[in-house]
Amino acid sequence: MKILILVAAGLLFLPVTVCQSGINVSDNSAKPTLTIKSFNGGPQNTFEEFPLSDIEGWTGATTTIKAECPEDSISTLHVNNATIGYLRSSLSTQVIPAIYILLFVVGVPANIVTLWKLSLRTKSISLVIFHTNLAIADLLFCVTLPFKIAYHLNGNNWVFGEVTCRITTVVFYGNMYCAILILTCMGINRYLATAHPFTYQKLPKRSFSMLMCGMVWVMVFLYMLPFVILKQEYHLVHSEITTCHDVVDACESPSSFRFYYFVSLAFFGFLIPFVIIIFCYTTLIHKLKSKDRIWLGYIKAVLLILVIFTICFAPTNIILVIHHANYYYHNTDSLYFMYLIALCLGSLNSCLDPFLYFVMSKVVDQLNP
């Protein structure tokens, strides 16, 4: 419980930075031209122009100049050819939507069946509460997938408006971290029940489980606020499409803010929970090694949880940090392709979580016949 409180406190500290961005210029002409790095857009004619030859020691190499951001919010951006190439690529318009269609077809019925099974369960109230919240989070994610599917199939052209874009983005990221934290709460709950049974017996099971889930929803909502506050929908001039979250205004959402925000998100939302889960289930396996059937059941559950973390959550968070560090320190978005693929893998948890419920329910039933 103390660890969860520490996590909650850490999640509330969002870094505040000053809007600042750099533009990469490699042209040898007398004046710099507007060159926007992939997936970061900029308004037209908002950059200070001066002869590069005036820079002392300039030899024609790549130079970074400071952007002059407009005071008012804008909705139209200019991007480079690499960004447009990605937005029109088969990866973005065919492969990614195909994966999302598969997730929708499997995830919606799987989570509905899980909720139905949970509604019929009369014992192990903690298990019911945790998996109900997990299934609700996964189902919310799945029902927003048609918007993402239509977006990608339409050539990354968003037609559903700014509000829907922000909601979809919040649900997309929020589902992953909600699932991670709920799985962590489940691990803590099983650890207390097995390693400290007398302490666990004194706890009000229903209230304790609902409190933990409530904390998870509040923390995830607070950490998703930047996606709610910052503009996510931008119209691209040259390609005549409107993107949702794929292109951001470097002035409104500076690279320094994005870097520290996503690093803290990966640290508090993935790394710490992963360490807690490893500790809890390792202790459980050690405690139950003399009970063969229960021990084997926990081995299956732990392996499935490790699969979910290894395939779904680890690549997404690792590449997320590297991607934003790459842009923050080197002003390049070259890893965004890999990051989007990792996000697709991260979405698989919405289909794997229902299987985890059926495994865990058997283990709990063996512990409490």
Curated annotation (Swiss-Prot):
Gene3D superfamilies: Rhodopsin 7-helix transmembrane proteins. Residues 120-127, 189-205, 280-296, 361-369 are cytoplasmic. GO terms for cellular component: apical plasma membrane; protein-containing complex. A proteolytic cleavage generates a new N-terminus that functions as a tethered ligand. Residues 1-19 form the signal peptide. GO terms for molecular function: proteinase-activated receptor activity; receptor ligand activity; thrombin-activated receptor activity. The record marks 37-38 as: Cleavage. Residues 20-37 form a propeptide. It is a multi-pass membrane protein. Disulfide bonds join 165-244. It is found in: Cell membrane. The keyword Nucleotide-binding does not apply. PROSITE patterns: G_PROTEIN_RECEP_F1_2 (PS50262). Glycans are attached at residues 24, 81. Keywords: Blood coagulation, Cell membrane, Disulfide bond, G-protein coupled receptor, Glycoprotein, Hemostasis, Membrane, Receptor, Signal, Transducer, Transmembrane, Transmembrane helix. Residues 38-93, 148-166, 230-259, 322-335 are extracellular. One of its GO terms (biological process) is ligand-gated ion channel signaling pathway. SUPFAM superfamilies: Family A G protein-coupled receptor-like. The chain crosses the membrane at residues 94-119, 128-147, 167-188, 206-229, 260-279, 297-321, 336-360. Its main location: membrane. Belongs to the G-protein coupled receptor 1 family. High affinity receptor for activated thrombin coupled to G proteins that stimulate phosphoinositide hydrolysis. May play a role in platelets activation. This is Proteinase-activated receptor 3. The gene is F2rl2.
